[in-house]
Curated annotation (Swiss-Prot):
The gene is argH. It is an enzyme of class 4 (lyase). The keyword Signal does not apply. It is found in: Cytoplasm. It comes from Bordetella pertussis (strain Tohama I / ATCC BAA-589 / NCTC 13251). This is Argininosuccinate lyase. One of its GO terms (cellular component) is cytosol. Keywords: Amino-acid biosynthesis, Arginine biosynthesis, Cytoplasm, Lyase.
């Protein structure tokens, strides 16, 4: 009798899996742990329930399940949502994933109606739907965070439209720009990032549900109804493609990698600018840390860590590309590995953008240090060359003349603006008394007043444009 009871318990344990009737022995505990995803995919529980409710609504509308079944499913799902919100829902490793955990609890609550929910669908199209629902929400959040970051950058840019700093190429002083102009470069980058995410969302926003395992279903389902209920723009047009590809996730990770690349470039500059050797800015204390041994230290840990996290996001992109490259159609278990990289990419982006929007708005600008740095390195040499061109010289001749002048100034230990009119006319007689205004930092930036230029008036216009674009919804 004891042996029979033990055998029955083993059979019951094996039936924890929805597919267990096909097998003669249960999977090992190690295999359970190895193949289970519930520890990380349970974050999609609300999206899974949304998808299931829309599916149940369609099944009832099509006469595939009864109105009473639908009411029972809705009641059970509301109870499950309440348990999840209260933290009392019991997630079981034996049930593998978020889908089967919720289905098992639903059956416990409403009986056979819960068993009918899975009619006309597979976990293959179910999980693809969950991911798209989740990712759509994440994209909307990230687009708004990019808006906030751009707004913060434009606010500081407007305040510093005329704050002169050196512009660099090869990390060598090149030409004067304004700090506002420099910050607006990042506002442009993050604007394109938002556009990329919005474009990605269009391809995310197609409904896979109804593809079932891979070939569709023989039930008279109405996929368009489900799409409308869940706010999708349409349905995936091929059942094999719907369940097997994750290109929308790869595209999201690629957009995320670009966002983090731009964050990393900004981070590098924040670290450099905050260095005492440069001293262009200071960051608020809440974004910095100290040293356990050196009492004087104020370290820009947030931008440094963001720079490091860029590699993390890039790694998720490569992992997803590698995951997909060798898979035949249709669904393969490999695709279970898509979620952790997607989840971590979204989490990293969300946290990083939230912090940077706050940090950027609190940058303390050290304008005197910026100006002093711009006075070094012959930043207005190009202005002198342009001056000569406007007096009829070919640019290459003007370039050579100014190069000689710069070399002479280096030997004399002075700047071009320090030369007398007579000294300058020795290089070319066309140089007039107006040259010294041309060679000032203010004259240099003011001259670049075309669209996209660094003239303060243009910087103010561009900052105001970005502020208008990013005004709070």
């Amino acid at each position: 009798m004891a042996n029979t009871s033990h055998s029955s318990q083993d059979q019951f344990a094996n039936k924890a899996q929805a597919w267990s009737a096909r097998f003669s022995e249960p999977v090992s505990d190690l295999v359970k742990r190895y193949t289970a995803s519930v520890d990380f995919d349970k974050r999609m529980a609300r999206h899974d329930i949304r998808g299931s409710l829309a599916h149940a609504d369609m099944l009832a509308a099509q006469g595939i399940i009864s109105a009473q079944d639908l009411a029972d499913i809705q009641r059970g799902m509301q109870q499950i949502l309440s348990e999840i919100d209260a933290g009392s829902f019991q997630w079981l490793l034996d049930l593998e994933d978020v889908h089967l955990n919720i289905e098992k609890r639903l059956v416990e609550l409403v009986g056979d109606a819960g068993k009918r929910l899975h009619t006309g669908r597979s976990r293959n199209d179910q999980v693809a739907t969950d991911i798209r629902l989740w990712l759509r929400d994440e994209i909307d959040t990230l687009v708004d965070l990019l808006r906030q970051l751009r707004h913060a950058l434009a606010t500081v840019a407007l305040e510093n439209a005329a704050t002169i700093m050196p512009g660099f190429t090869h990390l060598q002083v090149a030409q004067p720009v304004t700090f506002g102009h420099h910050l607006l470069a990042y506002a442009e980058m993050f604007g394109r990032d938002a556009e990329r995410l919005a474009d990605c969302r269009r391809r995310v926003n197609r409904l896979p549900l109804g593809a079932a395992a891979l070939a569709g279903t023989s039930y008279p389902i109405d996929r368009e109804r489900v799409a409308r209920t869940l706010g999708f723009d349409g349905v995936c047009r091929n059942s094999l493609d719907a369940v097997s590809d994750r290109d929308f996730g790869i595209e999201f990770c690629a957009a995320g990698a670009l966002i983090m690349t731009h964050i990393s470039r900004l981070s590098e500059e924040l670290v450099l600018w905050m260095s005492p050797r440069v001293g262009f800015i200071d960051l608020a204390d809440r974004f910095c840390t100290g040293s356990s041994i050196m009492p004087q230290k104020k370290n820009p840990d947030v931008p440094e860590l963001a720079r490091g996290k860029t590699g993390r996001v890039n790694g998720h992109l490569v992992a997803l590309l590698t995951l997909m490259k060798g898979q035949p159609l249709a669904y393969n278990k490999d695709n279970q590995e898509d979620k952790e990289g997607l989840f971590d990419t979204a989490d990293t982006l969300r946290d990083t953008l939230t912090i940077f929007a706050d940090m950027a708005g609190g940058i303390k600008v050290k304008a005197d240090n910026m100006r002093a740095a711009a006075l070094q390195g012959f930043a207005t040499a190009t202005d002198l060359a342009d001056y000569l061109v406007k007096r009829g010289l070919p640019f290459r001749d003007a370039h050579e003349i100014v190069a000689h002048a710069v070399r002479d100034c280096e030997q004399r230990g002075c700047d071009l603006a320090d030369l007398s009119l007579a000294d300058l006319q020795a290089y070319h007689p066309s140089i007039g008394e107006d040259i010294h205004q041309v060679l000032t930092l203010e004259g240099s930036v003011a001259a670049r007043k075309h669209i996209g230029g660094t003239a303060p008036e243009r910087v103010r216009e561009e900052a105001q444009r970005v502020l208008a674009e990013t005004a709070g919804a």
